[in-house]
Amino acid sequence: MSNFNSSPVPTIFMSFFQMTKRVRLSDSFNPVYPYEDESTSQHPFINPGFISPNGFTQSPDGVLTLKCLTPLTTTGGSLQLKVGGGLTIDDTDGFLKENISAATPLVKTGHSIGLSLGPGLGTNENKLCAKLGEGLTFNSNNICIDDNINTLWTGVNPTTANCQIMASSESNDCKLILTLVKTGGLVTAFVYVIGVSNDFNMLTTHKNINFTAELFFDSTGNLLTSLSSLKTPLNHKSGQNMATGALTNAKGFMPSTTAYPFNVNSREKENYIYGTCYYTASDHTAFPIDISVMLNQRALNNETSYCIRVTWSWNTGVAPEVQTSATTLVTSPFTFYYIREDD
């Protein structure tokens, strides 16, 4: 058996050892990137341990380059930023700046783009919105007329007496149901009374009687309850009830002082509206009631800017009810119209 240590090394292993020997760099090799050999201008294939693949790559092998993703690029050996139509590079200071022009209704102020708003537009919670004036509202994102704001009333049927008509009464003796609705330049008025106190209902036992509800208003159209027969303020409609908020301006519901002036005797007849309503007696007989409406004409004091007086009267051969069978006095509704004051 031959000794292994004395055997010659096979040629194939010798070649492998020679190939794996570290190549000796020339004395002119520059160890600073790009690692050129000054004598040959060659890039030796090296991969220093301080080069991270994060942000760098070798392309081709041995040549260190940057990894660039849009909007970065390299053009002519320089790292550059791709800019679109809205950006540019300032030639003076090299700063990146916007290159945007604004067309109407957009406006550019400094570095901000804004929207020029005209009447009827505004912002709410950073959203563009339409401004709605009094009488308009949104319904399912559509603009519509707020019918409630065009109505001023006592409600459908007050739960308790709200009006004191009889001079002998020390408290409210009836319910006055009044509705005023603005319709263009006119107001449509709807009125009737329901008796509450026994004294008021006993009026039906008289053959000749009249009673008046006086309504006095200030310059904004608010009812002066201390002076008026109606002791509860009017308010806008909210469903079948009165709105609960304060009434700010009801001037547009008032009778026009131009059409129905105060204290002008020569035009006194213009201030009156006449008509007929009815009382249905216990035996179902319909008794006619004369009704007259006086608009403005006489002011009670300096507080009064507008007034409406409604008078009911009858003069019949027999009383609607006999003395011992007085029932609730309910007049049928009466509708009338008048020219309204400007809002």
UniProtKB/Swiss-Prot annotation:
Intrachain S-S bonds: none
Record's keyword terms, sorted: Capsid protein, Host nucleus, Host-virus interaction, Late protein, Viral attachment to host adhesion receptor, Viral attachment to host cell, Virion, Virus entry into host cell
Signal peptide start-end: none
Note: All late proteins expressed from the major late promoter are produced by alternative splicing and alternative polyadenylation of the same gene giving rise to non-overlapping ORFs. A leader sequence is present in the N-terminus of all these mRNAs and is recognized by the viral shutoff protein to provide expression although conventional translation via ribosome scanning from the cap has been shut off in the host cell.
Subcellular localization(s) per the UniProt record: Virion; Host nucleus
Superkingdom, natural source: Viruses
Protein name in the entry: Fiber protein
Induction: Expressed in the late phase of the viral replicative cycle.
GO cellular component: host cell nucleus; viral capsid
